Design a protein with these regions (language model features):
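C-terminal binding/interaction regions
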Residues: 1-55, 60-77, 81-155
Length: 155
Protein backbone atom coordinates (compact mmCIF):
# COMPACT_ATOMS: atom_id res chain seq x y z
CA UNK A 1 0.00 0.00 0.00
CA UNK A 2 2.85 2.41 -0.70
CA UNK A 3 2.03 5.97 -1.67
CA UNK A 4 -0.98 6.38 0.62
CA UNK A 5 0.03 8.14 3.83
CA UNK A 6 -3.27 7.35 5.54
CA UNK A 7 -2.83 3.57 5.20
CA UNK A 8 -0.42 1.38 7.16
CA UNK A 9 1.52 -1.56 5.65
CA UNK A 10 -1.51 -3.84 6.06
CA UNK A 11 -3.84 -1.36 4.36
CA UNK A 12 -5.60 -0.25 7.55
CA UNK A 13 -6.56 3.41 7.89
CA UNK A 14 -4.47 5.53 10.25
CA UNK A 15 -4.07 9.17 11.09
CA UNK A 16 -0.68 10.41 9.88
CA UNK A 17 1.65 11.36 12.74
CA UNK A 18 2.68 14.98 12.17
CA UNK A 19 4.53 15.39 15.49
CA UNK A 20 7.92 15.89 13.84
CA UNK A 21 6.71 18.26 11.13
CA UNK A 22 7.70 21.90 11.40
CA UNK A 23 5.06 24.48 12.31
CA UNK A 24 4.73 26.87 9.37
CA UNK A 25 2.24 29.48 8.24
CA UNK A 26 -0.15 27.79 5.83
CA UNK A 27 -2.97 29.11 3.68
CA UNK A 28 -5.39 27.58 1.22
CA UNK A 29 -8.02 29.06 -1.07
CA UNK A 30 -10.87 27.10 -2.60
CA UNK A 31 -13.72 28.07 -4.91
CA UNK A 32 -17.10 26.76 -5.96
CA UNK A 33 -20.44 28.02 -7.16
CA UNK A 34 -24.18 27.63 -7.02
CA UNK A 35 -26.03 28.08 -10.31
CA UNK A 36 -29.48 29.64 -9.86
CA UNK A 37 -32.39 30.87 -11.96
CA UNK A 38 -32.65 34.49 -13.09
CA UNK A 39 -35.62 34.93 -10.73
CA UNK A 40 -33.58 33.82 -7.73
CA UNK A 41 -30.61 35.97 -8.72
CA UNK A 42 -32.91 39.00 -8.97
CA UNK A 43 -34.16 38.32 -5.44
CA UNK A 44 -30.61 37.97 -4.10
CA UNK A 45 -29.69 41.29 -5.71
CA UNK A 46 -32.88 42.97 -4.50
CA UNK A 47 -35.33 42.27 -1.72
CA UNK A 48 -33.83 38.91 -0.75
CA UNK A 49 -35.27 35.41 -0.58
CA UNK A 50 -38.17 34.53 1.76
CA UNK A 51 -36.00 32.51 4.16
CA UNK A 52 -33.75 35.48 5.01
CA UNK A 53 -30.32 36.84 4.17
CA UNK A 54 -28.96 33.96 2.11
CA UNK A 55 -25.53 35.49 1.56
CA UNK A 56 -24.95 36.18 5.27
CA UNK A 57 -26.19 32.72 6.24
CA UNK A 58 -23.94 31.04 3.67
CA UNK A 59 -20.92 33.10 4.75
CA UNK A 60 -21.36 32.17 8.42
CA UNK A 61 -22.10 28.53 7.59
CA UNK A 62 -18.91 28.32 5.54
CA UNK A 63 -16.81 29.67 8.41
CA UNK A 64 -18.51 27.30 10.85
CA UNK A 65 -17.98 24.41 8.44
CA UNK A 66 -14.25 25.10 8.22
CA UNK A 67 -14.05 24.91 12.01
CA UNK A 68 -15.79 21.50 11.98
CA UNK A 69 -13.68 19.92 9.22
CA UNK A 70 -12.02 17.24 11.38
CA UNK A 71 -15.47 16.15 12.58
CA UNK A 72 -16.62 15.66 8.98
CA UNK A 73 -13.56 14.32 7.14
CA UNK A 74 -12.12 11.05 8.49
CA UNK A 75 -8.44 11.21 9.49
CA UNK A 76 -8.29 15.00 9.04
CA UNK A 77 -6.16 16.59 11.76
CA UNK A 78 -7.78 19.12 14.08
CA UNK A 79 -5.74 22.28 13.62
CA UNK A 80 -5.81 25.74 15.11
CA UNK A 81 -7.50 27.85 12.45
CA UNK A 82 -6.28 31.42 12.73
CA UNK A 83 -8.53 32.87 10.06
CA UNK A 84 -11.26 31.94 7.60
CA UNK A 85 -12.87 34.23 5.06
CA UNK A 86 -15.79 33.33 2.83
CA UNK A 87 -16.71 35.64 -0.04
CA UNK A 88 -19.91 35.27 -2.04
CA UNK A 89 -20.44 37.15 -5.30
CA UNK A 90 -23.78 37.15 -7.07
CA UNK A 91 -23.22 37.05 -10.83
CA UNK A 92 -25.52 36.60 -13.82
CA UNK A 93 -25.82 32.81 -13.41
CA UNK A 94 -25.60 32.27 -9.67
CA UNK A 95 -23.29 32.78 -6.72
CA UNK A 96 -19.51 32.33 -6.82
CA UNK A 97 -17.98 31.28 -3.48
CA UNK A 98 -14.34 31.73 -2.44
CA UNK A 99 -12.94 30.65 0.92
CA UNK A 100 -9.48 31.18 2.35
CA UNK A 101 -8.24 29.45 5.50
CA UNK A 102 -5.09 30.35 7.42
CA UNK A 103 -3.10 28.74 10.22
CA UNK A 104 0.35 28.26 11.69
CA UNK A 105 0.47 24.50 12.25
CA UNK A 106 2.05 21.19 11.24
CA UNK A 107 -0.41 20.33 8.49
CA UNK A 108 -2.25 22.23 5.78
CA UNK A 109 -5.65 23.91 5.63
CA UNK A 110 -6.76 22.70 2.21
CA UNK A 111 -9.60 20.59 3.59
CA UNK A 112 -10.81 23.48 5.75
CA UNK A 113 -10.99 25.80 2.73
CA UNK A 114 -12.78 23.15 0.67
CA UNK A 115 -15.20 22.42 3.51
CA UNK A 116 -15.94 26.13 3.92
CA UNK A 117 -16.86 26.40 0.24
CA UNK A 118 -18.92 23.20 0.32
CA UNK A 119 -20.94 24.20 3.38
CA UNK A 120 -21.47 27.74 2.06
CA UNK A 121 -22.79 26.28 -1.21
CA UNK A 122 -25.05 23.82 0.61
CA UNK A 123 -26.43 26.66 2.72
CA UNK A 124 -27.06 28.79 -0.35
CA UNK A 125 -29.10 25.94 -1.85
CA UNK A 126 -31.02 25.56 1.41
CA UNK A 127 -31.75 29.29 1.64
CA UNK A 128 -32.93 29.54 -1.99
CA UNK A 129 -34.68 26.20 -2.58
CA UNK A 130 -38.17 27.62 -1.98
CA UNK A 131 -37.64 30.01 -4.90
CA UNK A 132 -35.31 27.84 -6.99
CA UNK A 133 -35.42 24.09 -6.32
CA UNK A 134 -33.06 23.60 -9.29
CA UNK A 135 -30.09 25.29 -7.61
CA UNK A 136 -26.96 23.37 -8.61
CA UNK A 137 -23.65 23.17 -6.78
CA UNK A 138 -20.52 22.73 -8.88
CA UNK A 139 -16.88 23.42 -9.54
CA UNK A 140 -15.63 23.03 -5.96
CA UNK A 141 -11.85 22.91 -6.12
CA UNK A 142 -8.64 23.99 -4.47
CA UNK A 143 -7.09 27.05 -6.13
CA UNK A 144 -3.95 27.75 -4.08
CA UNK A 145 -2.01 26.62 -1.05
CA UNK A 146 1.08 27.94 0.69
CA UNK A 147 3.38 26.76 3.46
CA UNK A 148 4.68 23.42 4.55
CA UNK A 149 7.42 21.22 3.15
CA UNK A 150 5.96 21.10 -0.36
CA UNK A 151 5.75 24.90 -0.60
CA UNK A 152 3.30 26.93 -2.65
CA UNK A 153 0.92 25.43 -5.18
CA UNK A 154 -1.45 27.18 -7.57
CA UNK A 155 -3.97 25.79 -10.04
Amino acid sequence: MSGFTHLDAAGAARMVDVTEKEVTVRTATATGRVDLTAECIALLRGEGVPKGDALAAARLAGIMGAKRTPDLIPLCHPIALHGVTVELVVDDTGVAVTATARTADRTGVEMEALTAVSVACLTMVDMTKAVDPRGTIGGIRLETKTGGKSGPWQR
